[in-house]
Swiss-Prot record:
<dbReference type="GO" id="GO:0009507">
    <property type="term" value="C:chloroplast"/>
</dbReference>
<dbReference type="Pfam" id="PF01824">
    <property type="entry name" value="MatK_N"/>
</dbReference>
<keyword id="KW-0694">RNA-binding</keyword>
<protein>
    <recommendedName>
        <fullName>Maturase K</fullName>
    </recommendedName>
</protein>
<dbReference type="InterPro" id="IPR002866">
    <property type="entry name" value="Maturase_MatK"/>
</dbReference>
<keyword id="KW-0150">Chloroplast</keyword>
<keyword id="KW-0934">Plastid</keyword>
<dbReference type="InterPro" id="IPR024937">
    <property type="entry name" value="Domain_X"/>
</dbReference>
<dbReference type="GO" id="GO:0008380">
    <property type="term" value="P:RNA splicing"/>
</dbReference>
<dbReference type="GO" id="GO:0006397">
    <property type="term" value="P:mRNA processing"/>
</dbReference>
<comment type="similarity">
    <text>Belongs to the intron maturase 2 family. MatK subfamily.</text>
</comment>
<keyword id="KW-0819">tRNA processing</keyword>
<comment type="function">
    <text>Usually encoded in the trnK tRNA gene intron. Probably assists in splicing its own and other chloroplast group II introns.</text>
</comment>
<dbReference type="GO" id="GO:0008033">
    <property type="term" value="P:tRNA processing"/>
</dbReference>
<dbReference type="InterPro" id="IPR024942">
    <property type="entry name" value="Maturase_MatK_N"/>
</dbReference>
<keyword id="KW-0507">mRNA processing</keyword>
<dbReference type="GO" id="GO:0003723">
    <property type="term" value="F:RNA binding"/>
</dbReference>
Amino acid sequence: MKEYQVYLERARSRQQDFLYPLIFREYIYGLAYSHNWNRSIFVENGGYDNKYSLLNVKRLITRMYQQNHLIISANDSNKNPFLGYNKNFYSKIISEGFAIVVEIPLFLQLSSSLEEAEIIKSYKNVRSIHSIFPFLEDKFTYLNYVSDIRIPYPIHLEILVQILRYWVKDAPFFHLLRLFLYHFCNWNRFITTKKSISTFSKSNPRLFLFLYNFYVCEYESIFLFLRNKSSHLRFKSFSVFLERIFFYAKREHLVEVFSKDFSYPLPFFKDPNIHYVRYQGKCILASKNVPFLMNKWKHYFIHLWQCFFDVWSQPRTININQLSEHSFQLLGYFSNVRLNRSVVRSQMLQNTFLIEIVSKKLDIIVPIIPLIRSLAKAKFCNVLGHPISKPVWADSSDFDIMERFLRICRNLSHYYNGSSKKKSLYRIKYILRLSCIKTLACKHKSTTRAFLKRSGSEELLEEFFTEEEEILSLIFPRDSFTLRRFYRNRIWYLDILFRNDLVNDE
């Protein structure tokens, strides 16, 4: 990020802190290219086309200003008749430029806030997305009720842009951003359908995620205020790093809205045991108290989205369940609280008592059905989980084919090693292992049985030991009790920064 600071200081000295001129800087697109090229992907490493011209980008922006009276809908051809260039390709280039430009000043504000709060070191320790599970194991065993909430999408992208305007004050920049969304994202509708937003998020992932994260950050800031008003306790693990422009005016308006809808003031409902966890567009709300207070929080969320962000949300989409009877899905895991009952005989003098002890344990397991569905979509097996060959990889060498399957198998094993039950993980390994053998047999135009007999199945299957198993097998014998016990225990890795591509929370 030192490159960001150098480029931003240079641009500030020349352009007096405006973001709009940065759109026409070539190093901005170089940073965007470097970000996409170096980002690690779990399943397959995809390239990024670097055959772009800054001159063509400038011409396209100029043409957008000159032809702003024309409506270029999503049904138009990929070739713009006025330019002769691929419209979809250059729209992605410009969206990358927008995303990288607005990220620069906000990242510097975030870094300075983190340094002032002196939490840089602790922040680096919890960068892994798996660091959330030790928190769940520590807190959720004492809770009784849970609500699985899907954060609704805005009905129009203009809502996301307006939220961004509270942070960045640059009228030309936002004029160009709106013009871009109008021309290339079919923004000439009063209501943007979910399909249109999904299409935009896939074609412009970085820009959409940036706008969406602003929307989530805004709603969570207000939620933090409500939570502090409803509890004597304060968040110690959460900080508002950036200044909230117009936040106090919004807060007063929000209190007025809630005071009209509820007959009791917010401080009346004290809930010190509320816990909130979110990843991307899904959040988990859990509490120890009665469902009445959880139901109040449910209505707070609905009124917040509908009255403050103009986002429609139905009350029936948010369910409140007992944690011991309901599993919630987060980051590709199914989690629930299991009750372990044990009977202890206690004797006092000549009287004997039987005492039933109930202990709670958080079970975190691999969702086998969604994972098999993802493997079937990637053509590793059918919908029933039966392994099949992958003919599209048959043109590669034997080493490359095995290396691809090994990479996927190791990444899945690395990601799901925190599971309480490893049986489902072993089944996934078996599917990938047999799919690899079938692919190699298909390449050599042989049956699976004949290929295994000719190549030696033991040596081939030995390659599918994960890196952790290989290291541990050098320390402990493969048939030792210590090694088998270590395999059964949960292991959380703090180096996982991205969710696996085969993981699906839907």
